[in-house]
Amino acid sequence: MSYYTLPPIDPIIMSLGPISIRWYGLMYVIGFFATYFLVRQQIQRHQFTQLEKNFDNLNTVLILCVILGGRLGYVVFYNLSYYLQHPLEILATWHGGMSFHGACIALILGGLIFCKIKKIDFWATADVYVATIPIGLGLGRIGNLINGELYGRVTEQPWGIIFPNGGPLPRHASQLYESLLEGLILFIILWSLRNRPWKRNSLTPHGTILSLFLCLYGLFRIIIENFRQPDPQLGFIVAHITMGQLLSGAMILCGLTLWFWRIHQKKRATAL
């Protein structure tokens, strides 16, 4: 059987002196801009003046959270022993190594602290933002595909792809699977439900979209990890379970706990 061979693609689009513009970085930038404009649209629609006054400052904080949290998450979750021996490599983000789970933790903590200081409704803010996050996730996986990294396990399926750095055998294009599930499909679901928390339903209080995001992303990631090649420095953590699946399972538990807690809070507030 003949399989498609992914040609080697230069990860650098262009260089301007010492500055290199990379495909992966470009995907991040497009994701940030998409989030910026869609969130601003929602702020104006729902007249969320608390957030509107602090919008640009919060965006700056969240961008830093993505970069710092994503990098530190990779260091801690995926290669801690290496970075303890080579601490300066933690700063070398251009060598690759970002974790969405780390970025997610940093985004929630950073957003929570900012909203508390500025006296903004955190749960409403989180719902507005997370409905757009799958755009960046989907684009990021396209960047991984272009870089020929994070490829899937060996397969005999006719849609297998031979990757430049993946050896001679065809593999699952797990980057495309993730881009579809964690990107397009997750975005369609969250975006279609984005207005529910504003309708004062006791089953969909503010925080519902965040809860749903945690649950669905966790579920989709667990599914895709069955096709994705485990990180070589870690392999399987327990039996055939990867680090990504363990972290995603924790996300699902957090999402369910948060949703039930927010419903309980909403019912108590209504009773009063």
UniProtKB/Swiss-Prot annotation:
Keyword annotations from UniProtKB, A to Z: Cell inner membrane, Cell membrane, Membrane, Transferase, Transmembrane, Transmembrane helix
Transmembrane region(s): 19-39, 58-78, 94-114, 207-227, 234-254
Annotated residues for binding of a 1,2-diacyl-sn-glycero-3-phospho-(1'-sn-glycerol): R141
Keyword flag Transmembrane helix: yes
EC number in record: 2.5.1.145
Stored InterPro entries: Lgt
Domain of life: Bacteria
Subcellular locations according to the entry: Cell inner membrane
Protein's pathway: Protein modification; lipoprotein biosynthesis (diacylglyceryl transfer)
GO-annotated cellular components: plasma membrane
A GO BP annotation: lipoprotein biosynthetic process
One Pfam family cited in the UniProt record for this chain: LGT
Topology in the lipid bilayer: Multi-pass membrane protein
Broad EC category: transferase
MF-aspect GO terms: phosphatidylglycerol-prolipoprotein diacylglyceryl transferase activity
Record has Ribonucleoprotein as a keyword: no
NCBIfam families according to UniProt: lgt (TIGR00544)
Free-text function comment from the UniProt entry: Catalyzes the transfer of the diacylglyceryl group from phosphatidylglycerol to the sulfhydryl group of the N-terminal cysteine of a prolipoprotein, the first step in the formation of mature lipoproteins.
Family classification: Belongs to the Lgt family.
Protein name, entry field: Phosphatidylglycerol--prolipoprotein diacylglyceryl transferase
Source organism (scientific name): Desulfotalea psychrophila (strain LSv54 / DSM 12343)
Lineage: Bacteria, Pseudomonadati, Thermodesulfobacteriota, Desulfobulbia, Desulfobulbales
